[in-house]
Amino acid sequence: ACPTDRPVEVRDKAIILLLARLGLRASDIRDLRLDDIDWRSGHLTVKGKTRRPDRLPLPQDVGDAILDYIVAARPKSVDQHVFLRSQAPFRSFRSPAEIAGIVARTRERGGIEGVPTGSHIFRHSLATNLLRAGAGLESVGTILRHSSPETTAIYAKVDLPMLMKIAQPWPGDLPC
């Protein structure tokens, strides 16, 4: 659980949830604008690498965290980006690297060591967990908004225990 005692922690929690639950890229979060969120239908629109708008479901916990940030912690600003820097001047992040910095600080606050750094680890983790839960590569690619199955295969870190679960048993002494 992310602490939310300070406004910056409220913001960081919402960002971490977007990364972990929706597998958004850091640039998706940096570019997210207030009017990209449809609160009535529970969806948000992201324009990923292709700049093609994709409409994604907004899970309740993620929506709640974003709303907490907007209502209670987001600095007053004319900037229409959802997430702003926590210190003046209050404007959007300049680069996705600032999101990676948030991930690193959150990891440090949580005492998490020995794991890869950066925000992209959440996309890898989401893909792996979906595959372990039985989702197909095509479904995972759709969720991650990949245009190519080869890209999804890179994210789909398959481990030996999972391979053993899906592998066919050795035929043994079957007649030829």
Where do the language-model regions lie?
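Conserved catalytic core of the tyrosine transesterase superfamily
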Residues: 1-176
